[in-house]
Design a protein with these regions (language model features):
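C-terminal amphipathic helix plus adjacent low-complexity
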Residues: 132-159
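Mobile beta-alpha loop/short-helix "lid" or hinge segments that flank ligand
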Residues: 34, 120-131
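A donor-sugar binding/catalytic signature common to diverse glycosyltransferases
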Residues: 58-99
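Donor-nucleotide binding loops and adjacent catalytic segments primarily
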Residues: 1-64, 105
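Residues at secondary-structure transition points
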Residues: 11, 53-60, 71, 98-102, ...
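Catalytic binding pocket for nucleotide-activated donors in carbohydrate/polymer assembly enzymes
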Residues: 86-121
Length: 159
């Protein structure tokens, strides 16, 4: 199953959903696709979609997914990486009114440069990213949360 995640941003991100729909129509995606559409009005007979679910339900979907296609939300990306998922990241862009600025572009570039994700930029094609993801081996993601907790504990212990 492919899981598409648009996050909770209150601006629509129809561009990503249309890309996925187009690849289904072309036969490049043959498996089940589930999409969390958030505030994006969208309907497609080939995509099972919902606007929002609670955290536990999203985690179950992430666990079931073979591939994640997502916006460049740091929380979404890191959660999927921690679960060892292959991820295609498509940043929301200001010029399409998908966000208020282009910070998702920088986030995407950072995760891509570190070898964690396949990035899909404005002019690139989803079909190429789908081909690339087949052989892509993402770098293992190590969260800094535990390290941060240990530093706080050490600090408190030494007060």
């Amino acid at each position: 199953m492919i899981l598409v995640l648009l996050g909770t941003q209150d601006k629509p991100f129809l561009r990503l959903l249309k890309m996925v729909s187009k690849e289904i129509d072309k036969g490049n995606i043959k498996e089940k696709v589930v999409a969390q559409t958030g505030y994006t009005a969208f309907s497609d007979k080939n995509i099972e979609s919902f606007d929002f679910k609670n955290k536990e339900e999203i985690e179950k979907l992430i666990d079931k997914a073979r591939l994640i296609i997502t916006h460049a939300g740091v929380g979404t990306i890191t959660e999927c990486l921690e679960k060892g998922k292959k991820i295609i990241v498509v940043p929301r862009l200001k010029k399409y009114l998908e966000h208020t600025n282009d910070h998702q572009m920088q986030i995407t570039k950072e995760f891509e440069m570190k070898g964690y994700v396949i990035a899909l930029y404005d002019k690139s094609r989803l079909s190429a990213a789908l081909d690339k993801i087949k052989t892509f081996k993402p770098k293992k993601y190590e969260s800094n949360s535990e390290n941060f907790r240990m530093k706080i504990k050490d600090y408190i212990d030494n007060i």
